Amino acid sequence: MKSCIYPGSFDPFTLGHLDVIERSANIFDKVIVSVGENASKKYTFSLEDRLNSIKNNVKHIPKVSVVSFSGLLADFAYESGCKVVIKGVRNFQDFDYERLLHDIGLTQQRGIETLTIFSKSELSHVSSTAAKEICKNGGLLENYVPLSVKQELETTLNGQLILGVTGEIGMGKSYFSEKFCYVESIYGFDIKHIDLDKLAHDILHNRTERVYIDLRHSILKEFGLSIGNESIIDKKKLGQIVFNDRPSLKKLNDMMRIPIMTRIRKEIGNFKGCILLNGALLVEAGFLPICNNNIVVVKSSKEKQFYNLTQRGYSVEQIENRINSQLNTDTKIKLIEESINKYGHGKLFEFTNYVGEEEFDQIDKIKRWIDCYLY
């Protein structure tokens, strides 16, 4: 049986590491991912956390085992019966460094050879150090680490856990969010509610930065001058256009994606605690990874949904157009479940509004889940 060792500190485990493991498994019958432990080195994650993180993200590869080691790699490889050590190489600096380590290994006379696997071009910038720095500054991590690791970084380095709140329009997402924040505050927990509708309103009405003025100009150019000017976009007039035409709604979502994500990062800032990200279009806009696939889908009766929307001043026709322009509850749930399966990480909660004391039981279930990660 051909076997190899892939050593590293994996602090944290990245998509680059995962790629090297998957490619090694195509060559060897057995891949031993070996997590090094050096008493003189300071790690972000404990040895146990690193082992569990890797095991969770390689469980789809049957040829892989995950173990820890200390001391000389050459000795560990020798006692493991492996003649080949795999090293991932991203650039010339990596190559020179790994060549030096290989030469040092040869002096230990264990007959161990080094096989270098060059990173894919789209992963050549990925490193554990870069992932940690990006996390500390609130940047996008989806292309650096698996979602489970992204969540581990956010909770460990930033003290943050992001929970998405979504559902059809008029189902009571804000009602749930406000009630949840109230319950959490009673227990003395820190929680922040970010309403994506309010962020969008701020971008379309108030932001004076040049990039947002240019965005409003682009929206006017796309949807017509009748919806406002470069200073203010009339959301109702814009809504009459996009909620009657799904391609137009998708176009608007695409235009707003980066501005919204930028404002989300600004809103989150250095806040420590649970962050509720409330938006009807979390699924449609591709925001599930921001929440690490941790989502509360808010549900209610159709009668209550219509009542809530009529209270906002919408006509029956406007209500039907808005409902029909968005994914229904069952479809949202299906797509969230598919995303959880795809990324191997996430948690789906279903919350039914306006059911009296049962609401507190549902909230308590979500609260206990949050406590496992933050408190």
Feature annotation, model-predicted:
Residues 14, 66-68, 275-280, 325:
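Short gly/ser/thr-rich secondary-structure transition/capping motifs
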Residues 27, 77, 98-113, 258-270, ...:
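ATP-dependent NMP and nucleoside kinases share a basic, alpha-helical "lid"
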Residues 198-272:
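ATP-dependent small-molecule kinase phosphotransfer cores
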